[in-house]
């Protein structure tokens, strides 16, 4: 199973990594990152959800129709579900070798398999990549992609023939209920891992069930079932030490409706999903009350009750350092996997109070302060993203003058109504003080620009200055 790695935004936006420059002007990018002291001119429909068997699909295995007085048996679970679990592989047809493997299970009319999007992502994003299955009896076959849900890391693929008995989808069980995670990882064959439902994660941007069981590598996309045999979640991630995460089956039921409704343009569907998710995620930013803290002369917004977390990242100055700073970083745990090269949905911002430890000449201070004026950024493939476009300006924040640089990098693939999903970056540095400065850095990835500008403006509007 591919574990979705969170980008270390704290490290990327902290000084050691932020020193990485943007592409040079010689590459055609005008960043506007001049020294701070240098002044510039101001400037879906219905369908079968798979929740029950019907006349058009094979009867479910016996356990799927288990009654309350039927004794539970792991042996029966093993026998009933083994034929309905498949290994799903993405193959580079140019080499004949796999680039990823995971698990899948039969849903819908019996020709479909559910799996994780990240298991088959190479087939979406790369040429000459195809999707195949291996059954528990070692039979192999080709699969075609029907629909994806990148927000919840789900995909539905299909064969051109019936694969077997379909699973039934169920709801989230009571906290503490026993669950059984199934998969066909690597060359190990069909396995069952038992664990406990610990409920839906509360302070997270993603709907996930916390599962206390050892979801193993290659089990991504496999089902987790209750004692009645209903799929309550799809294996998606593991953090080790018997901590696993499941996507609630309700999201798969929604995707199944889309898959059954007809052909889907995958890139258009992904763009729609990203836009809809951004709108829902950022709506509370404009309505919720924000926690605030004071750093230097500024009172700044930090958390607002969602998944944002803030940390102190103040560097410890060396004895010989002429200047020092106190810094706060706030970032969300939200991430949407598109490919190994592209993960979007991140939101983070840094406040830094920079000051002279002892009085020094103004020119010397501004030289040191200018080193703080740089932007973090994601390395993007030129195949998938356009060039950076940056503008410099002078604005008032908290009643004080700031120099700003704002940069965008648009996606070439995910565009709707003329607006691309883009990465947005902003740095603002206070100017006019001789021995003290203040910087604000904001990073939003995979967002429509109009919404991103509103988010940045709302954040900056809440900042106030006061004399100590």
Where are these regions (language model features)?
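N-terminal activation segment of mature serine protease catalytic domains
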Residues: 22-27, 32-103, 264-314
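Catalytic nucleophile loop of clan PA
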Residues: 105-106, 214-235
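Surface-exposed amphipathic alpha-helical segments
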Residues: 253, 263, 306-308, 435-468
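Secretory pathway targeting signatures of secreted, lumenal, and periplasmic proteins
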Residues: 308-364
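Signature of long, low-cysteine stretches enriched in small and polar/charged residues
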Residues: 367-429
